[in-house]
C-alpha cells in the first residue's frame, strides 16, 4: 500500500510538485477513523481515503488520486505498482444525437382539461405553451448574479452591512424599501422606455386569498434579464414587494443608486418605556465581571439628544481562511474494488479488500444465474415484470444511457420506471461481466417512497433489503453491498453524502424531477457540473408526464425517452357533477360567531361555487352555492363514498387532503360514523409524519367486501404507487410554506393545487381498471388554476443551501446559485450571505469558519444550530436540541378546537411558554415510555398527544446530538436533565435566554387581550394554538409584557406562533441587535424602550460580546467546554443569574390566575384529576410535576385557584421567585448548576434517579448505523 504513496510522490517530484496531505480524525471516540485528503496543484480533484490508522488512510488517498491520473491518461495503469484495480474501459461519450428527443408527445399533456363528456375527443396541444418562463437563452442563466459577484470582489462594500435593518434588511440593499422602490422602478421604466407589466396570480381560498406578482425586465446596458416573483396579502402589496426585489437587484448590479432620501417609517404604535428593577447587588456583580473580562464600557452621553450605541464589536474573530479561487466540483470516481460508496470508506479487511474487479464480477454473475435457475418464485416475479409498460423500452433506455452522459426518461406514473430502470442497468452490467463497475444511487423526494420502492425492488429480486438493493433515509438505513448494488435515498441524504464526493457510483438517477423542491434543484446544479468535469458518469433524470423541455435544455439538449403507460382511462368529474350524482344537500351552516382572523368577508365575485353551467339542475346550483370554497366538504366526501358503494366496482379510494390536521379530523369523522366505522371499511391515513409501520398498511390488500379508504396529502401524487386504487376524491388543495424575506413572514397557506397536480392525482385512479376521479372544485375554479406550482427555491430562505455550497467547496454562493435551473433573485442570495456572516459562519473571505462547518452539518436552521452550541456551553444541550428538533415538526397536541385546553396548557407550568410546554411534554412522554409501548400509548391517549410526532422529535434530537458529539462536543454537556416548570429552575431560565437568541428577530410586546406588537410596533395577535392565548375577550396581564416567538403566520391577521415569555434583561442579552442609550432610556432595536441604568445595559451587552467570543473559541476546539478558565466560568454564571426572572424584578407566580376566564370547564376534570398518569404505583407526575398540575401551581380549584396554592406546595423557602437575587431556592449564587442535586432538585421533585442519564449514555454507546440526513 505504501508503494502507491511513494509512487505518487516520485511522479509529482519529476514535475516539480508536491502532493499535500490533510488528515483529520472522524467518527466518535468509540469508532475512531482517520480521513485523509490529498491534492496536487494544477489538478481540480481531491483524492480521498480513510482507515483506522493514519498511514493506511494516506495510502488509500494516494491510490484514489493515482486512479484519477490513470483515468485522465496522465499515467498508464501498468506503470502503477501493485495496482490490483484495472480501470474500466471508458464509456463512449458521443455528444447527444437527439434520438427520440421529442418523439411523439403523449396525449395526456398540459393544457386546460376539457369537459368530461368530450374528454376523449380533445387533444391537448399546449405542451410548449405552458413553458416555465426560462429567463432568456441559456447563456443568460444567472448572469446577473455572476456580474454582481465579480463587481463585488473589486469593491467590498462592507459599510452597508452594518446599517440599520429597516424592513429588517433594507440597509443591505441600498436602503430601498417597500415605500420607495416602486416609484424608483417607474422612473427607470420611463427613462429606458420599458413597458413594465406585473403578472398577478391568485393564491389560496377566498377567505385567505393572497397574490403573487411577477415581472421579468431586460436591462439593455448589461444585455440580460432580471426576474422577481413576490407574495403579498393583496395586489398592491404583492406589486410593491415585486418592485422592491427588482430595484434591489438593479442596485446590486450597479444600475440604480442607493436611496439617499429620508426613509419614511410608518409610525407603528409606540411602546411605553418599561422600568427594569435591577438590584444594586446584581449591578455591582455585573460591573466586576466586565472588569475581569477587560471590557471598556462607554460613559453615558453628555447630550441626551445624541444617544450612544452600547453594542461592543466582536471580541474574537475567526482567522480568515484562504479564499477558494477555483470553482469546485464534487469529486467523482468510478467504482473501485476496495471502496464502499455507501459508507464512503475504504475496504481494508475481508475478502473484498484484495479481490480484483474481474473476480467480483464473476462471483456476482454466477450468483445471479444460479438464483434465476433455482428460485421459482423469482421466475414468477420476472414474468410479472415483463408486463410493465417500461419493459418494451428496455433496450432503447440502455442504449441511450450508454451513449449519453445525461438521459431524461418521461413516463406516466405507474409505468414502472422507478423500480425497473435501475434494475435494467444493474442486470445489464452483471450479465456482461462488468458487475464491479456498477453502483446506482436513486433519489426520491420523500422518505416513504425511498423505503417502499427499495423494499419492492428487493422483493422483485428475491431478496431482503441489504443485498443488491438498500435504502438510506433520515433516521434509518439498510445499506446494500459495496458492488453491483442500487441504493434508494432521499435527496437530502444524497446531499449530505456529497461531502465525501460521488465516488464509486456509476449512475445517479434523480426521480420525480418535476417536483422542483429546493434540494432537487440544488442537486441538479451539482450534477450538471459533475457531468461537465467527468463525462463518464451517467445521470438519468426521471419525471412524470409533464413538460420536460426545460430540463432537456438545462442538460445540454440531452435525449428524452418517452415511456407510455398502460394506464386505463379515468373518467373525471367536478364539484357540480359530484353534487348532481349524489343529490347532495349541504348541512345547515353553523350559527356560531366566527373569529375575525379565521374568516374573511367572502368576495362573491371570486367564489367560483356560484358559477354553474346551465346543464345542471336548480337543486345542484343551490347546493353548490351554499358550499364555501374555503372549506373541505367532509359531508360531500361521505356522500361520494356511499355513491361509490352503489357502483359495485371494487377498488380502493384515495382521498387527497391538504395537511395532517384535515386528515386526522376526516379519519375521526368517518370512524365515528357507524357506516364507515364498521368492518366494511378500512380508513388509513398517509402522511410523511406518521410512523413507517402505519405508512406500510396502505399497500396491503384488503379482504373481499372491505373498502380501503386512504386519506393522503400530495405524498401519494407521484412518489408512491398504490396498486388497487380505482377512485380518487381530490380536494384540489395543498399546503405550502411561503416565506417573505423583507419582513421575515412565514405564510402557511392552504392553496389551490396546480393543473399539473390535478392531472397527476387523476392518473392514480387508472391502475388496475378504468377509474373515476372526483375533483372537489368547480369547473370555473379549475379554469383559473395555475399550470405549475412555484419552485421552492423562490419561496424559502437560502441560508441552509448556502452553507451546503460552502461545505461542498463549490465556490461562491452567488456564482453557484446563478447556475440553477431557475436562479433565485439576487437580493435573496445576498440576504443569505449576510445572515451567515452575522452568525460568524462565514469569514471575511466568505469561506466557512469552524462554526460554519458545524452548522453546515446540522440539518437545521443555522441560527438554531448556533443556539445548540451555546446550549452545550451551558450544559443544557439536550433541552436545546429537543426544542430545536421539535420546531421541525407540527405540535404534538391533538386539539379539536382552535385553542388549547387545560390538559395541554398545564405542560407550560407557570412559564407562559409554548417552548417550555413542548419540553415538558417531551420529558413526560420520555418518562412514560420507560414503562413500555403500552404505557406510552396510554399516556399519549390520556394527554391527547400525537405519539408519531413525539417519536420523530426524539429521532431528530438524537441525530442532532450525535452530530455535535461527532464534532467533538463532550457527551456530558448533552446529557438529559429534568426541568421543573412550576418552580424556580435556573437551567430552564438559561434555556429560555438561549431560545431568545435562536428565534431573533421575533420579539413582541403584549398590549391587551390577544393583541401584541412586533418589530417596529406593528400589530399582530397571539396565535390561537399558544398556551398564552386567552380563552375569551377578558384582558390579560402577564408578569412581563415581552415575548419571543417562533414564526409570524399570516392568515387574515398576522399572528405569532410558538411564544415564550422573556424578561427585558434576556432581550438585552440575547435578542437585540442595536442598543442605544441616552443616559435615561435604553432603546433596543429602535422600538423597545427600557428604563434601566446606562451602566447595567452596557455591561449586559458586553456579556453578549464575551459569550460570542467564547463560541468562537469553543467551535475551534469543542472539548474545552469541560475545562473553561475561571473568568469564562464566572461570565457564564453571571449570564445564568441575569436569566432569572427575579433578576429583572419579575415574579412569575403573579400569573397563576392568568387564565381567569370564569371557572374551569367541568369536562376537563376527567383528564387531570389527581396527579395524572400513573405507572406501577409511582405517578409520572410525582412530586414537583404532580403538585404543579393539581395541588400546586394552579390551585386545587383549577386555574382560578388561589395564588397562594404554589406556596402551599413549596412553602416559604425564600418566597419562591421573590427570593433574594442570589438565587432563592438554590442558596448561594454559585449553586450547583450542572449537578442533578442542587437546592431545589435535591428535594426529590420529579426525579427518576440515574435512569435517564444512564439511558442517554447507553444509547450513544451503541452508536447508530448509516443515518445520513
UniProtKB/Swiss-Prot annotation:
Q: Where is this region: HA2?
A: 831-919
Q: Where primarily located?
A: nucleus
> What species was this sequence derived from?
Pongo abelii (Sumatran orangutan)
Modified-residue entries (Omega-N-methylarginine), positions: 1175
UniProt keyword list: Acetylation, Activator, ATP-binding, Biological rhythms, Cytoplasm, Cytoskeleton, DNA replication, DNA-binding, Helicase, Hydrolase, Immunity, Inflammatory response, Innate immunity, Isopeptide bond, Manganese, Metal-binding, Methylation, mRNA processing, mRNA splicing, mRNA transport, Nucleotide-binding, Nucleus, Phosphoprotein, Repeat, RNA-binding, RNA-mediated gene silencing, Transcription, Transcription regulation, Transcription termination, Translation regulation, Transport, Ubl conjugation
Lineage, please? Eukaryota, Metazoa, Chordata, Craniata, Vertebrata
Domain Helicase ATP-binding: from-to ranges: 398-564
What Gene Ontology cellular-component terms does the record carry? Answer: actin cytoskeleton; centrosome; CRD-mediated mRNA stability complex; cytoplasm; cytoplasmic ribonucleoprotein granule; cytosol; nuclear body; nuclear stress granule
Give the Enzyme Commission number.
Answer: 3.6.4.13
Say if the entry is tagged with keyword Transcription. yes
Tell me a GO biological process for this protein. positive regulation of DNA repair
Protein's name according to its UniProt entry? ATP-dependent RNA helicase A
Q: Subunit details for this protein?
A: Component of the coding region determinant (CRD)-mediated complex, composed of DHX9, HNRNPU, IGF2BP1, SYNCRIP and YBX1. Identified in a mRNP complex, at least composed of DHX9, DDX3X, ELAVL1, HNRNPU, IGF2BP1, ILF3, PABPC1, PCBP2, PTBP2, STAU1, STAU2, SYNCRIP and YBX1. Identified in a IGF2BP1-dependent mRNP granule complex containing untranslated mRNAs. The large PER complex involved in the repression of transcriptional termination is composed of at least PER2, CDK9, DDX5, DHX9, NCBP1 and POLR2A (active).
Ranges where the record places region OB-fold: 958-1074
Q: Where is this region: MTAD?
A: 331-380
Reported modifications of this chain:
Methylated. PRMT1-mediated methylation of undefined Arg residues in the nuclear transport domain (NTD) is required for nuclear import of DHX9.
Q: Which residues carry this modification: Asymmetric dimethylarginine?
A: 1166, 1218, 1234, 1241, 1248, 1264
Substrates-to-products reaction catalysed: ATP + H2O = ADP + phosphate + H(+)
N6-acetyllysine-modified residues are 146, 191, 199, 1024
Keyword Membrane set for record? no
* Positions that bind Mn(2+): 418, 512
Amino acid at each position: 500500500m505504501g508503494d502507491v504513496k511513494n509512487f505518487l510522490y516520485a511522479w509529482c517530484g519529476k514535475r516539480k510538485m508536491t502532493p499535500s496531505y490533510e488528515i483529520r480524525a472522524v467518527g466518535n471516540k468509540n469508532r475512531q477513523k482517520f480521513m485523509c485528503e490529498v491534492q496536487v496543484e494544477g489538478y481540480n480533484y481531491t483524492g480521498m481515503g480513510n482507515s483506522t490508522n493514519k498511514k493506511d488512510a494516506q495510502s488509500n488517498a494516494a491510490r484514489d488520486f493515482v486512479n484519477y491520473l490513470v483515468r485522465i491518461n496522465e499515467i498508464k495503469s501498468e506503470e502503477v505498482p501493485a495496482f490490483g484495480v484495472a480501470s474500466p474501459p471508458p464509456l463512449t461519450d458521443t455528444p447527444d444525437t437527439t434520438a427520440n428527443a421529442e418523439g411523439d408527445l403523449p396525449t395526456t399533456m398540459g393544457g386546460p382539461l376539457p369537459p368530461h363528456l368530450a374528454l376523449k375527443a380533445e387533444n391537448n396541444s399546449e405542451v410548449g405553451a405552458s413553458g416555465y418562463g426560462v429567463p432568456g437563452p441559456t447563456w443568460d442563466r444567472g448572469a446577473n448574479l455572476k456580474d454582481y459577484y465579480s463587481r463585488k470582489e473589486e469593491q467590498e462594500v462592507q459599510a452597508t452591512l452594518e446599517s440599520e435593518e429597516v424592513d429588517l434588511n433594507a440597509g443591505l440593499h441600498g436602503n430601498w424599501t417597500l415605500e420607495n422602490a416602486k416609484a424608483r422602478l417607474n422612473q427607470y421604466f420611463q427613462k429606458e422606455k420599458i413597458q413594465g407589466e406585473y403578472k398577478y396570480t391568485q393564491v389560496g381560498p377566498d377567505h385567505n386569498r393572497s397574490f403573487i406578482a411577477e415581472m421579468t425586465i431586460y436591462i439593455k446596458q448589461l444585455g440580460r434579464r432580471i426576474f422577481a416573483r413576490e407574495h403579498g396579502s393583496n395586489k398592491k402589496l404583492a406589486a410593491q414587494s415585486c418592485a422592491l426585489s427588482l430595484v434591489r437587484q438593479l442596485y446590486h448590479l450597479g444600475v440604480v443608486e442607493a436611496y439617499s432620501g429620508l426613509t419614511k417609517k410608518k409610525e407603528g404604535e409606540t411602546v411605553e418605556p418599561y422600568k427594569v428593577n435591577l438590584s444594586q447587588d446584581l449591578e455591582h456583580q455585573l460591573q466586576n465581571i466586565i472588569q475581569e473580562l477587560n471590557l471598556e464600557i462607554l460613559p453615558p452621553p453628555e447630550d441626551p439628544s445624541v444617544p450612544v450605541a452600547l453594542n461592543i464589536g466582536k471580541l474574537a474573530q475567526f482567522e480568515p481562511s484562504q479564499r477558494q479561487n477555483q470553482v469546485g466540483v464534487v469529486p467523482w470516481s468510478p467504482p473501485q474494488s476496495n471502496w464502499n460508496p455507501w459508507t464512503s470508506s475504504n475496504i481494508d479487511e475481508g475478502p473484498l479488500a484484495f479481490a480484483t474487479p474481474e473476480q467480483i464480477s464473476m462471483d456476482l454473475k454466477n450468483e445471479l444465474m444460479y438464483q434465476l435457475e433455482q428460485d421459482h418464485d423469482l421466475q414468477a416475479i420476472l414474468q410479472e415484470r415483463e408486463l410493465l409498460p417500461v419493459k418494451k423500452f428496455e433496450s432503447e433506455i440502455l442504449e441511450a444511457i450508454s451513449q449519453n452522459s445525461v438521459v431524461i426518461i418521461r413516463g406516466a406514473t405507474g409505468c414502472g420506471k422507478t423500480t425497473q430502470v435501475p434494475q435494467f442497468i444493474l442486470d445489464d452490467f452483471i450479465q456482461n461481466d462488468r458487475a464491479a463497475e456498477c453502483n446506482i444511487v436513486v433519489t426520491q423526494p420523500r422518505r416513504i417512497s425511498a423505503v417502499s420502492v427499495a423494499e419492492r425492488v428487493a422483493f422483485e429480486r428475491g431478496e431482503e433489503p441489504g443485498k443488491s438493493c438498500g435504502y438510506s433515509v433520515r433516521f434509518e438505513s439498510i445499506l446494500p453491498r459495496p458492488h453491483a448494488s442500487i441504493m434508494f435515498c432521499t435527496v437530502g441524504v444524497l446531499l449530505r453524502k456529497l461531502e465525501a464526493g460521488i465516488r464509486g457510483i456509476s449512475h445517479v438517477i434523480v426521480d420525480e424531477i418535476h417536483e422542483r423542491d429546493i434540494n432537487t434543484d440544488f442537486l441538479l446544479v451539482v450534477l450538471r457540473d459533475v457531468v461537465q468535469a467527468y463525462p463518464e458518469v451517467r445521470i438519468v433524470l426521471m419525471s412524470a408526464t409533464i413538460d420536460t423541455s426545460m430540463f432537456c435544455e438545462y442538460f445540454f439538449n440531452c435525449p428524452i425517452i418517452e415511456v407510455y403507460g398502460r394506464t386505463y382511462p379515468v373518467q373525471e368529474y367536478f364539484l357540480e357533477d359530484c353534487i348532481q350524482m349524489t343529490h347532495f344537500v349541504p348541512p345547515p351552516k353553523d350559527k356560531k360567531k366566527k373569529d375575525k382572523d379565521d374568516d374573511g368577508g367572502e368576495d362573491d365575485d371570486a367564489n367560483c361555487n356560484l358559477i354553474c353551467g346551465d346543464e345542471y339542475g336548480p337543486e345542484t346550483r343551490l347546493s353548490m352555492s351554499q358550499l364555501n370554497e374555503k372549506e373541505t366538504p367532509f359531508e360531500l366526501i361521505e356522500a361520494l363514498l356511499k355513491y361509490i358503494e352503489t357502483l359495485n366496482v371494487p377498488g380502493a379510494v384515495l382521498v387527497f387532503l391538504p395537511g395532517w390536521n384535515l386528515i386526522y379530523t376526516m379519519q375521526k369523522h368517518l370512524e365515528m360514523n357507524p357506516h364507515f366505522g364498521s368492518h366494511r371499511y378500512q380508513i388509513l391515513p398517509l402522511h410523511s409524519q406518521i410512523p413507517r409501520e402505519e405508512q406500510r398498511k396502505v399497500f396491503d390488500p384488503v379482504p373481499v367486501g372491505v373498502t380501503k379508504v386512504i386519506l393522503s396529502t400530495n405524498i401519494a401524487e407521484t412518489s408512491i404507487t398504490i396498486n388497487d386504487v380505482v377512485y380518487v376524491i381530490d380536494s384540489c388543495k395543498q399546503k405550502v410554506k411561503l416565506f417573505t424575506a423583507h419582513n421575515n413572514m412565514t405564510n402557511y397557506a392552504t392553496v389551490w393545487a396546480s393543473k399539473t397536480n390535478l392531472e397527476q392525482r387523476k392518473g392514480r385512479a387508472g391502475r388496475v381498471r378504468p377509474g373515476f376521479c372526483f375533483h372537489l372544485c368547480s369547473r370555473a375554479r379549475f379554469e383559473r388554476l395555475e399550470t405549475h406550482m412555484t419552485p421552492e427555491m423562490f419561496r424559502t430562505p437560502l441560508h441552509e443551501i448556502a452553507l451546503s455550497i460552502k461545505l461542498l467547496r463549490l465556490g461562491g454562493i452567488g456564482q453557484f446559485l446563478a447556475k440553477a435551473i431557475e436562479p433565485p433573485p439576487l437580493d435573496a442570495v445576498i440576504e443569505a450571505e449576510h445572515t451567515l456572516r452575522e452568525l460568524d459562519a462565514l469569514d471575511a473571505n466568505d469561506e466557512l469558519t469552524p462554526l460554519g462547518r458545524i452548522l453546515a452539518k446540522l440539518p437545521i436552521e443555522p441560527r438554531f444550530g448556533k443556539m445548540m452550541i451555546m446550549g452545550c456551553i451551558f450544559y443544557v444541550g439536550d433541552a436545546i436540541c429537543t426544542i430545536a428538533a421539535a420546531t421541525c415538526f407540527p405540535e404534538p397536541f391533538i386539539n379539536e378546537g382552535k385553542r388549547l385546553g387545560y390538559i395541554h396548557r398545564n405542560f407550560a407550568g407557570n412559564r407562559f411558554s409554548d417552548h417550555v410546554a413542548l419540553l415538558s411534554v417531551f420529558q413526560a412522554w420520555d418518562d412514560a415510555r420507560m414503562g413500555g409501548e403500552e404505557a406510552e400509548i396510554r399516556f399519549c391517549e390520556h394527554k391527547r398527544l400525537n405519539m408519531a410526532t413525539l417519536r420523530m422529535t426524539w429521532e431528530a434530537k438524537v441525530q442532532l446530538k450525535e452530530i455535535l458529539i461527532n464534532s467533538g462536543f463532550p457527551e456530558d454537556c448533552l446529557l438529559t436533565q429534568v426541568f421543573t416548570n412550576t418552580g424556580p429552575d435556573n437551567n430552564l431560565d438559561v434555556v429560555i435566554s438561549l431560545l431568545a437568541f435562536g428565534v431573533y428577530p421575533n420579539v413582541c410586546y403584549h398590549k391587551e387581550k390577544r393583541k401584541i406588537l412586533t418589530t417596529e410596533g406593528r400589530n399582530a395577535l397571539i396565535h390561537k394554538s399558544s398556551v398564552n392565548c386567552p380563552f375569551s375577550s377578558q384582558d390579560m396581564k402577564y408578569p412581563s409584557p415581552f415575548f419571543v416567538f417562533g414564526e409570524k403566520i399570516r392568515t387574515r391577521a398576522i399572528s405569532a406562533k410558538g411564544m415564550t415569555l422573556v424578561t427585558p434583561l434576556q432581550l438585552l442579552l440575547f435578542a437585540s441587535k442595536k442598543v442605544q442609550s441616552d443616559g435615561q432610556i435604553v432603546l433596543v432595536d429602535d422600538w423597545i424602550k427600557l428604563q434601566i441604568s446606562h451602566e447595567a445595559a452596557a455591561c449586559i451587552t458586553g456579556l453578549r460580546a464575551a459569550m460570542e467570543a467564547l463560541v468562537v473559541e469553543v467551535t475551534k476546539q469543542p472539548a474545552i467546554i469541560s475545562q473553561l478558565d475561571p473568568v469564562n466560568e464566572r461570565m457564564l454564571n453571571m449570564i445564568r443569574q441575569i436569566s432569572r426572572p427575579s433578576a429583572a424584578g419579575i415574579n412569575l407566580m403573579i400569573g397563576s390566575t392568568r387564565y381567569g376566564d370564569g371557572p374551569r370547564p367541568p369536562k376537563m376534570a376527567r383528564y387531570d384529576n389527581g396527579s395524572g398518569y400513573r405507572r406501577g404505583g409511582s405517578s409520572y407526575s410525582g412530586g414537583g410535576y404532580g403538585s404543579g398540575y393539581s395541588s400546586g401551581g394552579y390551585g386545587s380549584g383549577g386555574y382560578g385557584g388561589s395564588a397562594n396554592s404554589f406556596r402551599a406546595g413549596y412553602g416559604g423557602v425564600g418566597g419562591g421567585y421573590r427570593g433574594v437575587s442570589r438565587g432563592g431556592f438554590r442558596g448561594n449564587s454559585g449553586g450547583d448548576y450542572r449537578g442533578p442535586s442542587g437546592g431545589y432538585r435535591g428535594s426529590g421533585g420529579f426525579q427518576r434517579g440515574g435512569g435517564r442519564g444512564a439511558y442517554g449514555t447507553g444509547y450513544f454507546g451503541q452508536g447508530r448505523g448509516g443515518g445520513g440526513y
